[in-house]
Amino acid sequence: MSLEEQYRTDANLNARIALHARFSTNPGWSQWLFDHEAPPSGARLLEVGCGPATTLWGANLERIDPSWKLTLADFSPGMIEAARDLLGDRADYVVADAQELPFDDGSFDVVLANHMLYHVPDRPRAFAEIRRVLVAGGVFHASTNGEGHLQEMGDLTADWWPFERHIDAFGLESGPPQLEPFFTDVRIERFDTGLRVTEVEPVLAYLRSSERYDGRDLAGERAAVAAAIERDGSFWVTTTPGLISCRKP
C-alpha cells in the first residue's frame, strides 16, 4: 500500500490512534503535547501533516486560543476534510506537501510537524521549507518516537514482516542531527507512557491498518496476544513518544 493510499482517509490512522487512546498507561499525551506546543496569544501557527487533527486539536478544543491564526496543512485531501469537519472555522485548511509549502517567507511564528516527518521522502527539503516560512526566531516543534517504540509489535510480526522502524528515518535520537544544519537550540523532551492492552482485537486492528499488511488472517498474532492477556492480565507494548523543538536562527 502506498503512502497516498494509506492516508487517503483517516481510517487507518484512527485505528492506530485508538490503540494508544484506549490503553495508554499515561492518557495525558494530547494535553502534554498541547502544553509544549501552544504559542503565545496572537501567534501565526502552521501544522504540516495535520492528519485528522484529533490528537492535538480535537482533544483540546476548548483550549484553542481564538487569537491564534491557525493553518492546517496535509498532502491528503481526505485528511484535510476530516480536520475541517472537526475544527470548522477555528483554522484555515490547505492541501500541501511539506516539501513545497505554498506560503510566503516568514509567514508563521510557530510550525508543528507531529509524528509525520519519518514519512517525508526529502526531509532536508522539508526542513528548508519550514525554516523559510518561519519568522526569524520562530519555533519548530516535531513530535516523534524514540528507541524501543512498539518493539513488542515487531516481535509479533517478526516471522513475516519486520516492523517499520520509523525512528531510523526521524526519531528522538536520529532527528536532532538532521535538524541542526537548519535550526538552533535543538532540544528533546520525552513523555513517559506505555500500552497495557487488555483486548486482542485492537492490536489486530492496529496491524491491519499498516501499509505493509497483506491480508493474512493474523491467527498466530491473535493467539500470542490472547496468551499474554491470559497469563499477565494484559499485553504490554513499549511506547516512547516525545518532542523535538528548535528555532530558526
Regions found by a protein language model. Give the residues of each.
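Conserved class I S-adenosyl-L-methionine
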Residues: 1-41, 54-58, 62, 79, 139-166
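Conserved Class I S-adenosyl-L-methionine
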Residues: 3, 20, 26, 52, ...
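Short glycine-centered segments of the SAM/dcSAM-binding site in methyltransferase folds
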Residues: 44, 137-139
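A short acidic, Gly/Pro-enriched loop at the edge of an enzyme's catalytic core
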Residues: 99-110
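Class I SAM-dependent methyltransferase SAM/SAH-binding core
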Residues: 44-100
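A short SAM/SAH-binding and catalytic strip from SAM-dependent methyltransferases
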Residues: 109-122
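A short glycine-rich, Lys/Arg-flanked "PGG" loop and its adjoining helix->strand segment in the class I
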Residues: 124-136
